[in-house]
Amino acid sequence: MTTDVLLYTTNWCPFCRRAKALLKEKRVRWKELDIEADPAHRQAMAEASGRSSVPQIFINGTLIGGSDELFALDVRGELDKLLGRNPPAT
C-alpha cells in the first residue's frame, strides 16, 4: 500500500523541519510544496486546509494539521496506522 503524504512548508519554518524529521525517521516519502516559492501553493493550501500557517500535512488526502498534530498522532500510535503500517508491539 502506498501512502500519499503531502506537506505545505517554507524553508525557514522550524515546525516544518520537525515534521519532516519525524517522517524521515519513519522512512516515509512525502511531496513537499513550498508556499513561498510558488504563490499557487499558498492558495491551494489555504483552500484545502482553511489555514495559513505551516506546515500543513495531509495523509491520503486527509488534513492532519501541523507538526503538533503529527506528533500527537505518533504518541497515540495512530500515525503508523494512517501510514498503513503495523504499529510496534509493546
Kindly give the residue locations of the regions a language model identified.
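Local sequence-structure signature of Cys/Sec-based thiol-disulfide redox active-site neighborhoods
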Residues: 1-29
